[in-house]
Amino acid sequence: MTPSEFRQSVRSGAFRQPTAGQCGPFAQANLAILPNAYAHDFLRFCQANPKACPLLGVGEPGAFRLDVLGEDLDIRTDVPSYNVYRDGRLTERVESLEALWRDDFVVFAIGCSFSFEDMLAREGIALRHIEEGRNVPMYRTSIPNRRAGIFGGQLVVSMRPLRGADAIRAVQITSRFPGVHGAPVHIGHPLELGIADLGTPDFGDAVTVRDGELPVFWACGVTPQTALMEAKLPLAIAHTPGYMLMTDITNASLAVF
């Protein structure tokens, strides 16, 4: 299935699941959508936190199509699930933004670690959340983001359990892709990130961590949602964690070496 065909399946309502493992060679994107009045500070926030918030594209006010991400792409309808935040609280999840869309909305598309999972799989590195048919586990850490204006919050990380040799190989592979979070930010000691229990992720689903495996943590594009919650904007929108926008950007094109 091509990315365009996948987006059509989302738009029609046929696909409403987490997007890990879909359209493997193509990049997926996190979304943050907010009024133009706050867009400059949010852009500075992303630039100040490039590990968690690597920008793939930024829209013009009111634009719901970003040609840099793909043809026949509609931000309002092509994500399986959206989070709606009002005054910093998650008030609803919706499957379309058509009724909520405003002419002053600015779209930020942020790289997603689902993008490099295809490369890991090609190297024989098994990914537990895909094996178990679950959403990837994500955790809010105790590490503060670099603040920009009203935006702060805490770093969010995704976790994949790997054996030692696979963890080393994963570092080597993902280091080539800083546009989709790059190398892990931590390996092995969740308490050092302020994570007390791997079995209770803040977002996504828990997965099995087997004896002899290390938890490997990558910066996560859900990080901006902690900033949106802390800023308490009257209205802001993001993807539901794990339910991403499929782009036409090839993962190979994002490699820096």
Swiss-Prot record:
Keywords from UniProt, A to Z, are: Lyase
Q: Kindly name one Pfam family recorded for this protein.
A: D-Glu_cyclase
Q: Which NCBIfam families match?
A: PRK05463.1 (NF003969)
> Which top class of enzyme applies to this chain?
lyase
> Which superkingdom heads the taxonomic lineage of this protein's source?
Bacteria
Q: Would you identify the family this protein belongs to, as annotated?
A: Belongs to the D-glutamate cyclase family.
Organism from which the protein derives: Burkholderia ambifaria (strain ATCC BAA-244 / DSM 16087 / CCUG 44356 / LMG 19182 / AMMD)
Which InterPro entries does the UniProt record give? Answer: D-Glu_cyclase (IPR009906), Putative_hydro-lyase (IPR038021), UPF0317 (IPR016938)
Specify whether Lyase is a keyword of the entry.
yes
Q: Does the keyword Phosphoprotein apply?
A: no
What PANTHER family does its record include?
D-GLUTAMATE CYCLASE, MITOCHONDRIAL (PTHR32022:SF10)
**Enzyme Commission numbers on file:** 4.2.1.-
Would you tell me the protein name for this molecule? Putative hydro-lyase Bamb_5282
Q: Which GO terms describe its molecular function?
A: lyase activity
